[in-house]
UniProtKB/Swiss-Prot annotation:
EC code: 2.3.1.234
Cofactor annotation comment: Binds 1 Fe(2+) ion per subunit.
Similarity remark: Belongs to the KAE1 / TsaD family.
Keyword Cell membrane on entry: no
Lineage: Bacteria, Pseudomonadati, Pseudomonadota, Gammaproteobacteria, Pasteurellales
GO cellular component, one term: cytoplasm
Protein name: tRNA N6-adenosine threonylcarbamoyltransferase
Length: 325
């Protein structure tokens, strides 16, 4: 079975082909970051138009990369949501039109399920069951995973997602879009313990997250440390970025440990754009070592939105649907 995957939920156009016998045989990705940078964030209408321009050419490139013809494709998976409505509509329309023309099934895939299963593409893939930490610009969730399609939401952000909080705080520091990535780089040069940020919602039971208060705390810290010219010196920027990042990471670690204790599981899977954060990866690895557990995450290119995770998830779903009963 060979599945074509199409991802168009936000500002990346991703197309990939997953082969049941060979694994991932094609992976094409186009990022719109440079286009949206001038606006300080994603402009939905521009995103949709760019997906229209890029999706079909990327499909042609993916088929060429895999040395396949349309007749070799057994199904098409596409991101059905969540995401930008117009962008999703582009991907779903193209996927369903091609599926009709090629006489193969089309399957809508939940964007976060794609992220959740992305670590399964690695050689050192996790076995079920596990706890998944899905952490991106739009979501921060802890999920109990017992198998494909067997998910239980344990906790999630009640306001800003972790990635969103990174981006907004980075913007307060005067960083260009995408500010979250730039802020993590700043944090590497920060002085530990100069600023003490709170660890929100860790003083009460439960597995939900809240990061909007950290953004407000950062705004107040920035205001209190402006010089006579109304600016922050570079080291203070680094120190604030470091304190903010450490607060987010510590909060996530506390919640992950609770989720593992609640489920009794020893495997933690992390996925989503923020899972590429070096500090988060290092601290989670250290925590899991102390807990005598394992942590898994995808390679950096599969942390952000991509077609590979959609193709693979579509393959797993269609394979399950085709199993004899």
């Amino acid at each position: 079975m060979r599945i074509l995957g199409i991802e168009t939920s936000c500002d990346e156009t991703g197309v990939a082909i997953y082969d049941e016998d060979k694994g991932l045989v094609a992976n094409q990705l186009y990022s719109q970051i440079d286009m949206h940078a001038d606006y300080g964030g994603v402009v939905p209408e521009l995103a949709s138009r760019d997906h229209i321009r890029k999706t079909l050419p990327l499909i042609q490139e993916a088929l060429k990369e895999a040395n396949l013809q349309p007749s070799d494709i057994d199904g098409i998976a596409y991101t059905a949501g969540p995401g930008l409505v117009g962008a999703l509509l582009v991907g779903s329309t193209i996927a369903r039109s091609l599926a009709y023309a090629w006489n193969v099934p089309a399957l809508g895939v939940h964007h976060m399920e794609g992220h959740l299963l992305a670590p399964m593409l690695e050689e050192n893939a996790p076995e079920f069951p596990f706890v998944a930490l899905l952490i991106s610009g739009g979501h921060t969730q802890l999920v109990k995973v017992d198998g494909v399609g067997q998910y239980e939401l344990l906790g999630e952000s009640i306001d800003d997602a972790a990635g969103e909080a990174f981006d907004k705080t980075g913007k307060l520091l005067g960083l260009d879009y995408p500010a979250g990535v730039a802020m993590s780089k700043l944090a590497e040069s920060g002085t530990p313990n100069r600023f003490k940020f709170p660890r929100p919602m860790t003083d009460r039971p439960g597995l939900d997250f809240s990061f909007s208060g950290l953004k407000t705390f950062a705004a107040n810290t920035i205001k209190a440390n402006l010089n006579e010219n109304g600016e922050l010196d570079e080291q203070t920027k680094c120190d604030i970025a470091h304190a903010f990042q450490q607060a987010v990471v510590d909060t996530i670690l506390i919640k992950c440990k609770r989720a593992l204790e609640q489920t009794g599981y020893k495997r933690l899977v992390m996925a989503g754009g923020v899972s590429a954060n070096k500090q988060l990866r290092a601290d989670l690895a250290e925590m899991m070592k102390k807990l005598k557990g394992e942590v898994f995450y995808p390679r950096p290119q599969f942390c952000t939105d991509n077609g590979a995770m959609i193709a693979y998830t579509g393959f797993l779903r269609l394979k399950t649907m085709n199993k004899p009963t």
